[in-house]
Amino acid sequence: GPGMLSKNYDGLQNDLDKMDGVFLKRGQYTYPLDKGSVWHFVPLVSVGDKVEASAWLGQVDENFQPLKIMVPFTQKGVCTVKSIVPEGDYKIEDVVAVLVDEEGNTVEVNMIQKWPVKRAMTNYKEKPRPFKLLETGVRVIDTVNPIVEGGTGFIPGPFGTGKTVLQHAISKQAEADIVIIAACGERANEVVEIFTEFPELVDPHTGRKLMERTIIIANTSNMPVAAREASVYTAMTIAEYYRAMGLKVLLMADSTSRWAQALREMSNRMEELPGPDAFPMDLSSIISNFYGRAGYVKLNNGESGSITFIGTVSPAGGNLKEPVTENTKKVARCFYALEQDRADKKRYPAVNPIDSYSKYIEYPEFEAYIAEHINDEWIGKVNEIKTRLQRGKEIAEQINILGDDGVPVEYHVIFWKSELIDFVILQQDAFDEIDAVTPMERQEAILNMVIDICHTEFEFDNFNEVMDYFKKMINICKQMNYSKFKSEQYEGFQKQLEELVAERSVK
């Protein structure tokens, strides 16, 4: 019901702010909603209207979000509205509407919804393939491997590769109405970090605190196993509740490996047959059913809502071949591989551009959307930079073996062009005010600029010249990324860049 935004829950939806002490006491439960709060209710239906489960009866405002009060999700068949209260202030347990079902029984409706967390809500008309780009402001995601509204993605990576910073950046900048964070089985200090940092973050879309539209579900690794298993389901169910209101929800789970470990412990205790690595035999179907609950839906009243799900996977020892990563890879459509090597070189975000992928780029619906909203050459250019990065990596290996003199100068040029793509497009400073968020218009300008340089032919006598020249170029481009888009400073750097390119290009 209303009153969940900016709350901190545990995996069983106990309100953590109402509890005291370091550990939860056995058998201690708290009610997740505030029974004393008063909400201003505005009716959306009138007496005699026909309604079904999850139809909107009225709306209340919470933290500037219009939340809908709906017919109970468990209601079967078509009901008729017998009475509805006038606009006014009510508590969550007050009856706001009385319905008559097909058998003539009266159903009293208040603002509270109850639903079992492990069952998916299917109260929508259809679930089309998602197609609308979800802007995150992170170039390595938006430009190279885009995720869509209602899409699924996962981020595997060993410790210290920046999973949490990347998640913070996405949750802060992505175009979502509600953000839900499920900290499932993380170390206690990381959960405390979320509790202390999130209230400080300012929402760039509204200028108010990000916490106003966030729900945190925290389960540290020393909480009971059953709660850890339930926490991810609880988060998904809350997300489905908001999706039924026609809102865009972003759900972040950190980390799904700990959730899978909880599944493993439960199944081992129940003496089920163990599968690979002692995980349950049906791990793949559990994971795919769970990911299948996310998505973009058309509701019965013609509105649309979406759940975009991004889960992190922290495989033991960074081994990407273990069952959780393998099974997640089958169902998630976007894969952002964070790697230790890039993190050690301080190339953040440390997403490996060659191993990572987004299957949405191949969707005809997505191509049509991009052609309409950006331009029709966009996807071709994105594929070109991926090819150039791959080629650059191959040449880097050759240079490593044969030495700088052992390969032709043209090879050095190809390698440095791929480095230019890496430094200018892939790398981004999450702590710089301007560089942290790159709008699509600016990403398009950066991509076009880099592609134009890559298409230019240059003349050099030896490999030292290539290196010095491209380092100068990368430096100017970096300064452009740090300056405000189309400001005087930006234009100045652009002029410098044009002069530098003209200096060496083949006439």
Which residues does each PLM region occupy?
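Short, conserved beta-turn/loop elements at beta-strand boundaries and strand-helix junctions
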Residues: 12-16, 62-65, 86-89
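Short coil-to-beta-strand transition motifs
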Residues: 1-5, 71-78
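Conserved hydrophobic positions within beta-strands
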Residues: 8, 56, 79-81
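P-loop NTPase catalytic core
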Residues: 143-144, 150-472, 486
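C-terminal amphipathic alpha-helical interaction region
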Residues: 461-507
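N-terminal accessory targeting/assembly segments
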Residues: 1-25
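P-loop NTPase nucleotide-binding/switch module
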Residues: 19-41, 46-55, 59-62, 68-74, ...
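PDZ-domain C-terminal substructure recognizer with occasional recognition of PDZ-binding tails
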Residues: 81-86, 93-96
